[in-house]
């Protein structure tokens, strides 16, 4: 299977506090790099003779495949989460209020988690857990750690490549800018699909 980059779903010039240069660099270099890396790993695995390949080679490739796959998927959720998508309402708002007590409580926790990752790396994810039938805020230290069985509804990339060009070490300002640019309709669509499945 050959993976392809999904088109950028937002208009970078219309985002508040995030430059076009930052968004295009992040999209092309980091997301695009993950897609290219996954295609290369997939091709290598397809050619690997499983009967004779050293187990450490297979293990290394499978680990890198997981990292590249999650990087690709999380970047797709991240970029799809950006834009002018109206306000939070409907079933997603109701679920956030049910699972966090209020939208303000959810936002305070999600934002604080992002700011705590400043200068580090990882993701902050609003994830639907089908096991528990609820939304959870999740910290993922890298591309290989996400909630098993969970579906990311909203993704905040906290690797330095996502903000350093615009904000330097001021990760907290980047988190605030991200929160102003959430495309709630797309997040609601992901939530509805996760609940249906």
Curated annotation (Swiss-Prot):
Alphabetized Gene3D superfamilies for the sequence: Iron/manganese superoxide dismutase, C-terminal domain (3.55.40.20)
Endoplasmic reticulum as UniProt keyword: no
Single Gene Ontology BP annotation: response to chromate
Short name of any one Pfam family annotated for the protein: Sod_Fe_C
Coiled-coil ranges from the UniProt annotation: none
Cofactor: Fe cation
Binding sites annotated in the UniProt record for Fe cation: 26, 75, 157, 161
Keywords, sorted A to Z: Chromate resistance, Iron, Metal-binding, Oxidoreductase, Plasmid
Catalytic activity: 2 superoxide + 2 H(+) = H2O2 + O2
Entry annotated with the keyword Phosphoprotein: no
Enzymatic class: oxidoreductase
The protein's Enzyme Commission number: 1.15.1.1
Reported induction: By chromate; induction increases when cells are grown in the presence of high sulfate concentrations (3 mM NaSO4(2-)).
Family as reported in the entry's similarity comment: Belongs to the iron/manganese superoxide dismutase family.
Assembly notes: Homotetramer.
Other comment: This protein is not essential for chromate resistance, however it may contribute to resistance under certain environmental conditions.
Function: Destroys superoxide anion radicals which are normally produced within the cells and which are toxic to biological systems.
Name of the protein described by the UniProt record: Superoxide dismutase [Fe]
Organism: Cupriavidus metallidurans (strain ATCC 43123 / DSM 2839 / NBRC 102507 / CH34)
Organismal lineage: Bacteria, Pseudomonadati, Pseudomonadota, Betaproteobacteria, Burkholderiales
This protein's encoding gene: chrC
